[in-house]
Amino acid sequence: LRGLGKTEDPIQPFSVADMADDAAALLEAIDIPAAAVAGFSLGGYILAQMLIRHPLKVRAAAFVSTQAGADTAERAEARVKTMRYVIDEGAKAFAEAFVPQLFSPTYAAAHPDEVGQTYEVISGQRPNSIAMLLDAMRQREDMTPYLDKINQPCVVIGGEGDALVSSLAMRNLQEGLSDCKIELIERVGHMSTVEAPDKVSFELDQLMQRAGMWM
């Protein structure tokens, strides 16, 4: 994503729709006409935009630990405070405050190494880039009205113990899609791909089979 990893530090603000365009452009650049796409958390917001803006690029869609709705006023205000915090205090302080929200308490207690790896990844990002990503999420569009335009096979996967995205929000996403299954995993938090990789992989495999991409 823009601003993360080895990408350049963004100068101008950008939107979730811009990141969806980036993803479509990447597929074009590496000569992949269409793909099964999984979007985790922020990636799910990007995937929803990609399905509307570049529908021919997506053959199947997996929404993982994510939702269709926009930020509430309270959540948007909290993001502004977090943006200021990460700029003032740095990425390490942000990671220390953020990472505990990502995992279920039981998993975090039993797997400190995995939690530590997540902390290292987040704390290694640039504060300005984190703030810009938070701002893009704060201003993202409510995609609920567009869900009935999506015809590709879809699946919603998440943890019932997710502290950031409610089970209700994930069910609302699934119900708005015409061809979509849902798997909510017990005793799993936001990091469903880390806490329950086998179950997530199974659902992705099932999605690929439904889309005729996997035998």
Locations of regions flagged by a protein language model:
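Alpha/beta-hydrolase active-site loop signature
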Residues: 1-5, 68, 189-192
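Conserved alpha/beta-hydrolase catalytic His-Asp/Glu region
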Residues: 70-77, 89-149
